[in-house]
Amino acid sequence: MEEEDKVYFHEVSFIDKVGQLRTSKIPVVQELARQLKGLNHLPDKFKRVHPDHQLVTPSFALPIPTINMAKLRLVAEPQHKVRAQELAKLASVAKEWGMFLITDHGVPSNVLHGVKDVVKGFFGLPFEEKKASVGSYASVENMGYGRNFVKSEDQPLDWIDRLTMKAAPEGTSEGLHVWPQKPTNFRYFPQNTCMLLSW
């Protein structure tokens, strides 16, 4: 990521169609959104054309599907059928909807709110601080603050900046160099969430 005439960029690398390593500068979406306040259209690089895409009218007639995490954790012999049914439901819902609500996950609401607050705190930092608070994303794993899925100069881009981290088991340091140092309590809530969700 670098600054160029007060326009901020993520620097991404990819292999082009002829097998050459290329580097491209992609605008930082959060900063671009601040600059474009009052604009009523997206920059062309972020537009997608889907000529065969049908217009879908939003409907709230169907409830969002739910997956019961407690049922997925059942391992005792008499409860295999319940677990198998919930796994089948998960596969079906993921395929048909692409999203679902998880219930009975065991994570207290204060921990979930804490995660939300520290992530908002991170994305609320000035660009320079976000950039400085994570490791390099030149890694093969492409973790950290930046962009993902850039495969060519001319592809339409997603309207997103992302922060990707690995929740490594306690005692290892794999992937932990990309965990933000700011806000100072950033690590506490996601780490507790991971511990609560570990089976």
Residue locations for each model-derived region?
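Peripheral, non-catalytic segments flanking oxidoreductase cores
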Residues: 1-199
